[in-house]
A protein has these predicted regions:
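Alpha-helix boundary/N-cap detector
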Residues: 23, 27, 31, 58-68, ...
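Non-catalytic accessory regions used for complex assembly or targeting
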Residues: 1-23, 126-137
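Amphipathic alpha-helical interaction modules
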Residues: 43-80
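Amphipathic alpha-helical binding modules
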Residues: 82-137
Length: 137
């Protein structure tokens, strides 16, 4: 027989059924600030020492971007099956927090654990312009 095809109306109907079957997912936290204060910091604790953390993390652009990504991943994982939260911890939270709090990480400028630092950025990595011959290849 002829190959099966889908009409636009069929796709619209399928999308409407999917939308009706699953109500919109409400986030547990309404902002990255709430997520960090109410979930992340109470649940992710480390012994002071080699770790860096700026209590004014919200003044550091990269920290805000990374923590926002972490918050989005948390909100997605909490709606999935139970193993999703374990995967969130192992594959997302742990590596992200290591990057944020390592001595060479985002809060490199903080001298003592928990001491507010000056959220200045180091000079960005430099890049020489690649030759046009390889840029257009």
């Amino acid at each position: 027989g002829p190959p099966m095809t889908y009409e636009d109306d069929d796709l619209d109907d399928a999308a409407a059924i999917d939308a009706a079957a699953e109500p919109p997912r409400e986030p547990l936290y309404l902002s990255v600030y709430d997520f960090v204060d109410d979930w992340l910091l109470p649940n992710y604790q480390r012994k002071p020492g080699p770790f860096r953390w700026d209590p004014n993390w919200f003044d550091n652009f990269e920290a805000v971007e990374r923590l926002t990504a972490l918050w989005y991943a948390f909100e997605a994982a909490r709606h999935d099956a139970a193993p999703a939260m374990a995967a969130f911890w192992l594959n997302t939270l742990d590596p992200m927090m290591r990057e944020l709090s390592s001595q060479e990480g985002v809060f490199w400028y903080v001298r003592l654990y928990g001491e507010a630092g000056s959220a200045t950025s180091p000079e960005p990595f430099k890049s020489n312009r690649a030759p046009d011959a390889i840029r257009t290849a």
